[in-house]
Amino acid sequence: MPSCHTDCIEKSVSNWFHKLGGFVGRNPWWFLLVPLFISAGLGAGFYFLEEREAHGIEDQFTPKDGPAKQERHFVKEHFPQNDSEFSRLRLYNEGSYGSFIAVSKSSDILSEKAFEEIIYLDGTVREMVGQKGKTYEKLCAMKSNRCFSNAMLDIINGTASTIKNANLTFPYHNSTSNTIFLGTELGGVVLNSSIIVSAKAVRLFYFLRENNKAENDDWLHGFTQVFSNLSDELNKRQIQVSYFTSNSREEEFKENSKSVIPLFSVTYFLAISFSIISCLRLDCVRNKVWVAIFGALSAGLAVLSSFGLLLLCGMPFAMTVATAPFLILGIGVDDMFIMISCWQQTQVHDNVEDRMAATYKEAAVSITITTLTDALAFYIGLLTPFRSVQSFCMYTGTAVLFCYLYNITFFGAFLALNGSREKGNRHWLTCMKVPEPEDSPEKYNICCVGGAYDQETGKEEVMPINNFFKMYYGPFLTNTWTKVFVILLYAGYLGSSIYGCFQIQEGIDLKNLAADSSYVGSYYDNEDQYFSEYGPNVMVVVTDSKFQYWDQTARKRLDTCLERFESLTLDGRSLVAKDMTLSWLNEYVKVINPNNKTIFMDSLPAFLQRSDFRQDVNISNKVIIASRMFIQTINVSTAVDEKNMLNKLRETANGCSEKLVVYHPAFIYFDQYAVIVSNTIQNIVVATLAMLVISLMLIPNPICSLWVTFAIASVIVGVAGFMALWDVNLDSVSMINLVICIGFSVDFSAHISYAFVSSKEVTANKKAVDAVYHLGYPIIQGAVSTILGVVVLSAAESYIFRTFFKIMFLVILFGVLHGIVFIPVFLTFFGICNFN
């Protein structure tokens, strides 16, 4: 059969590494010490770690240029907030506030005893003094020259006994002075017609003016401290209380990142222990304990150098980056095992320089492919609009490059020094010369003699696990019936994966950014349980400054648009409450119904001044630049509902004859749904094509390069499908892991594919056996070391870290399955090339 390999680049890379290996073998001390000095210098960047930390939820976990941010800019510019005439409805951001939810331990919270406790808590909040000496009264958002107040407390006028005769109606309650909306303050309501029979929960808000962030932050910190200190006392009362502030997510997010630091020591202990155990030999000369330790140390230096460099350059350090060291340790140790395996294939009687040259030549393409694919996958992740993903990808991609650099310098140098020790037949611990084994008892040989090797091949003795792959696993895998079973197994795997892909849920639940034990979780749970009936009260903004509000035909077109919003449904349920639309224009027309521009514009300022609508119309030189109305969404309780609601509202606004924009502060977070799937697919496609190019350049066989690319697609489908079945959503956190998946899915299949086409065996089956014989054990070692690197994250209290573990576990599991089961079998069918 004619040769069909394309190895010009592969040969050049191998030859260059052959020279580098020899150079490292001749000058090991330089290559050992220089990386240490570089790491020490770059490590100074950690001085800036606290300054570079990025904990902003909006900044890190929402699209950089999401539509809602542009809409917010328009609203902020045309409808500036007025803290002296505060209206929660009209906020263009979340505001600065503290809140608590009181849930009755009985069936009804509308009792005198329950409200006595609520009033007590309200008084405690109002009397609380922050460290800067400010009370709520000094900082509160104002309405009609008094602090913003909660409707439920206004209704009872601060007297708990009044609640018994309040005769509340829902969602609107008519008080003596005005109509009050209770949909956001009373939860778990049971009605008789519109009369409230009972309710389960009350929610109160304490909004602050936004002109002094430092004082607000101080007071809000005191707010959480007060409720934290009262927790034991509150548990003995009639109500259960959960609490939250506008700063809570970011504060808990920051604490969350610190919780993973103690796990680093456990991870390094596990990785080093596994490396040592894997490299243990009964021969006291061939033992590679110190090689294993320095391999793990090399990965640690890579993290120190890469992170330090980027911190010096001013790169933001997102919390998601905290998972990177666990990953880099696994990658570094994986390459270490490949290099050790190649070292063991060299002739023991050759000098160290020649052995190093042969080792580097053999390992060069494998570790170069994995490094390029891993690093490129991470750098392609920079295309995402999420800063948390960008930060992770920049730090991890750079760490992968440093890991590669230190493996071929620092670790290679120590491998050469260890080779010199072996050449001198010296003990691995004492470095004393020991006699070569002859006929001494085995126990004596372990401690006192060493340097044995295979007399036939002149190489180090093969480990039993390698013989297992050659004598048992390889022949079993290439058996015809086994191949049939593997094909059926793959079909089952692929079918389950595709099914799972159709079950994927999108979006990150904001409470998952805090630890499981955080007070934030209980507040969100109560909010979801008792206050999900009424969703965001959405602004509908008329952006056309030429719209003729005084023209009856124009008003009718606008009313038609509002009616379209009110008729929207989700899965057969109403999306917008039809009788709760708030329009300044409709109210104005009730007072005066002019079709004349002059009368309309002359009478408008007086109308606005006497109503709450004065913040809803932007007038300049008797021209209405913009105005806004409000629609009340309902039945929005899940992430899927949020996504569909946002899409339907925007589609309706775009479909109207007038220029409309819909906006609510929550849309900033909902925007992730619009880009998460398309962006993930974009990254995967771009990265897969890049991996194909790299494989074609470095693997001397186009068909096998295509199989590597196939492995990427197959592993990604598997991970995406099974992560959905494991209750992991597709969000910016799991997107990071799918980026990782692209790189890691190449690693194992690339090793095996390259070994297959490089094999000197004659038949395809023998090539497959030879490939798993040489690389089966290193692949298992690399997989286990990577799993050990992240397994401690399964015990973390954070969704982010547990998600990282889950997806990495799937990536490694499916990567190994492809590397030592699927790909070797498939190569025997389609990879028969490059031999006679």
Where are the model-predicted features located?
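Transmembrane alpha-helices and their membrane-interface boundaries in multi-pass membrane transporters
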Residues: P2-S3, G21, L33-L36, A40, ...
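Feature of extramembrane
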Residues: P2-W290, F294, L405, F411-I681, ...
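Alpha-helical membrane-interface segments at transmembrane helix boundaries
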Residues: G21-G25, K76, R249-V266, L297, ...
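Internal alpha-helical transmembrane segments of multipass membrane proteins
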Residues: F37, S257-K288, I293-S305, L372-I380, ...
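Hydrophobic alpha-helical bundles that form the membrane domains of multi-pass transporters
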Residues: S265-S278, A296-M394, C403, F410-A416
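Hydrophobic transmembrane alpha-helices and their membrane-interface caps
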Residues: R286-M339, I703-S753
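Pore- and gate-forming transmembrane helices of large, multi-pass membrane proteins
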Residues: T346-T384, Y404, T680, E761-E797, ...
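Membrane-proximal extracellular juxtamembrane segment immediately upstream
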Residues: F607-I736, G743-V746, A750-S753, G776-P778, ...
